[in-house]
Amino acid sequence: MNKTDILIIGAGPVGLFTVFEAGLLGLNCTLIDNLDKPGGQCAELYPEKPIYDIPGVPFQTAQEHVDALLEQIKPFNYDLHLSERVDLIEEITLENESFWKVKTTEDKEFISKNIFIAAGAGSFEPRRPPNIEDPDKYLGKGVEYAVRSVDKYKNKNVVIFGGGDSALDWTVELSKVAKLVTLVHRRDAFRGAQHTEEQMRALVEKGKVNLLTPYLITVSYTHLTLPTIQP
């Protein structure tokens, strides 16, 4: 079993910054993450998405933020275990002291007195659209769950389905490069930041964004149909 001062579940921005804070105290850390790279959803879902609300940093992409955190923790002692999940956490006693024992899906075992859970929304699973049977079969054929390269959508017609922060943020950002962005949401009300929603609606007024609410989306390989929700 591997012994560590702090075991961190999740290697996103919070998990990485925990390594920095622990390092200042001379503590070593072990990070475990289900993804194949550090950075959490910032690296997996929207590496090129601009971030404006980091204290002291007016503008930074999500991947730049992750890269800065990785650079920040270089001086400190930590181990990174990727592409595995925590399968078991149990309390054990060793030499009359209490520890946490952690076992992963790769059958690795760790013991630590401290566990920090920095897992965000948990192991990443895309939010699949309702009423579409097996949407994964369209991946790579015009359907994606994440924007990993803005240039891919340059001068393209883009349809975004969703009503939260990511949908609103990418509607605003992709409108700068896409031929036309259509935002589809199954409700009239949005769940994202008010400021971003106002930006989106301003783009609708300018004709740069086509807004369809309340709509559901159905997909086939050759066409899209957007039937309205009946009250």
Language-model-detected regions and their locations in the chain:
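FAD-binding core/adjacent interface of flavoenzyme oxidoreductases
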Residues: 1-9, 24-25, 37, 80-156
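Rossmann-like dinucleotide/flavin-binding elements
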Residues: 2-3, 7-36, 139-193
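Short amphipathic alpha-helical segments
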Residues: 19-21, 43-44, 127-131, 171-173, ...
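Conserved N-terminal glycine-rich FAD pyrophosphate-binding loop of Rossmann-like flavoproteins
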Residues: 36-59, 196-197
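Short beta-strand to alpha-helix junction loop
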Residues: 54-71, 187-197
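A Rossmann-like FAD-binding core segment of flavoenzymes
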Residues: 73-104, 109-112, 176-224
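Single conserved hydrophobic/aromatic residue that forms the stacking wall/gate
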Residues: 223-231
